[in-house]
Design a protein with these regions (language model features):
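Intrinsic-disorder/low-complexity, polar/charged segments enriched in Ser/Thr/Lys/Arg/Asp/Glu/Gln
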Residues: 3-5, 52-54, 97-99, 109-111, ...
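Solvent-exposed loop/turn segments flanking beta-strands in beta-repeat/beta-sandwich domains
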Residues: 35-38, 50-83
Length: 150
């Protein structure tokens, strides 16, 4: 699994207090998790070529507006304003402040782009990270424990 993280700070009158980050320690094969946790993932039994990635979200407070998206495009690190404009759209608003799950196909380049707006309406640091997951690196589904998204 390859990970590359780059943070950007926006030039604005007032810097936001929310500096969102995403992290994970392991991923699971989605079909295997569906077999052991049908209550939450039973509809994914045919998704053998997908990873279930439990993500931890840090740097935001309840009441912040959290935006994030997963994309497969190659990021141009020189165009941070373009990525802010793309992620900070209503369709990317998520009411998740602590954790989330991502279902990602194996052996594809992904980028997670996220930003949060604090209670004063100011954007914090733009977060980006690249992911490339291998099926052979999946953790044993017997060790999977569902955590409620919040």
């Amino acid at each position: 699994t390859r990970i590359f993280v780059k943070e950007f700070t926006f030039m604005s009158d007032v810097a936001g207090s929310s500096n969102i980050t995403f992290s994970y320690t392991k991923h699971f094969n989605l079909a295997e998790v569906a077999a052991v946790d049908a209550e939450h993932w039973g509809n994914y039994t045919a998704y053998d070529n997908f990873a279930l990635v439990p993500m931890t979200i840090n740097g935001v407070q309840e009441g912040d507006i959290v935006y994030y998206m997963v994309d497969t495009r190659v990021i141009d690190w020189q165009k941070e304003s373009q990525w802010l404009a793309e992620v900070a759209q209503e369709k990317n608003i998520k009411n998740q402040y602590h954790n989330c799950y991502m279902q990602l196909e194996y052996e594809k380049d992904y980028i997670i782009v996220a930003v949060a707006k604090d209670k004063n309406g100011n954007f914090g640091t733009l977060f980006t990270t690249e992911l490339y997951l291998y099926k052979s690196d999946a953790a044993d589904a017997a060790n999977y424990n569902y955590v409620e998204v919040k």
